[in-house]
Amino acid sequence: MIANDLKLDSSKIQLYYDQKYLRPIPYRCTLLTARMRDRQIIFMKYVGDLEDRKKNAGTKMTTEIDPSKRFLGEGEKPTNEMKMVGKNYGPRAVTVGFFEHKEKLKPNIDFQEESSCYAFRVSKEAIKRFQILSLQNGFEKHRVIFLFGRINKITGKITAHCGCEPIQTSYADHFEIDESFDIEKVCTLASFLGMELVGMAISHKPEEKFPMSEYMIRLAAKYQNKYGEYFTTLIVTPANDNDVSVEAFQVSDAAMKLEKGNYFAESKDPHVVEFKEELTVCQFKRKSADVNLFLCAVRVRQTNSKIPLHDFPSPGQEPSLLDLKQYLIDHESCPSWYTFFDFNFLVFIFLNDLISEDELYTITQEIKSKQEIAPSIYNKLNNLCNQL
């Protein structure tokens, strides 16, 4: 383990009991046969050519002033033991305790009962169209929709008021979000309305005992790390020919650590999560684990959205200026703030650069105060439509 960590040839490493390198520790011995005390300091001497390490490392050979940094987590400061070892034995000294500390930083995979999200309320309007399209397609392919709403961090309750289905390519066993879809701009819009990205819903055919597959675990862990611990994944499956079943899950803290530490490896089995190295799984060293070991069930129920309109198509349906023109015609008798109070309508005009970010902010403030939208913005959109 020491040789791998230092990128050295293990056959050219000699360990010693003393700092003067006079009492070598025999090769191929154990802690017991070597008669070493707990936390005993041992000394290492490399008898090979340092040019080998240059080639292996691919960089110039440099003197590491503080090797303890290699054994610390991101942003972590040296422990008292590390400081003491450096003070007593020099800045390059390391002990077994250093390696034990590094090992403890690795994810420990086990069942986790509680999650940050206590309950998830999703509005019927937010996923209604998503459910209808999934039923029409017979759930033959995986699809995803992002959910935006508000989080009560005191109670752990989340309410999703609207959904935005991204441009995506759907397959029988997974989906791929198009790189052209700018989720960050959609998050900016949501923030102007006092909301944030709170989760996603994935539709697929039900599989007994396995609500989420391996790639869903990895994706959920990625989003929970990026958008916060409350991010929740809804799984939408057919209940019968005319209705759907909705379940909610968060992935465990261990899954988030796996994603953050880049421990995930590609898996050929959708029911098994593979690791790049052996990790502790239920107190045993393993290189894989059952997908269900990473799931935390969340209470879910339906509610009503605070957003009045959900008529405009999502980006995933690839709306055009013709859809914009028809939408404005259909709502021309409504107050302008009400017409604009459709999340996917705002997504369309913002992502397609029909309005600037400053104009978007002004629109959202007028919507929240129920004031008429500035005529200059309304006229700009109407002029675009009249050119068709």
Regions from the language model: what does each represent?
Residues 2-3, 37, 131, 187, ...:
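Amphipathic alpha-helical interaction motifs in eukaryotic regulatory proteins
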Residues 149-173:
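N-terminal, Lys/Arg-enriched amphipathic/low-complexity engagement segments
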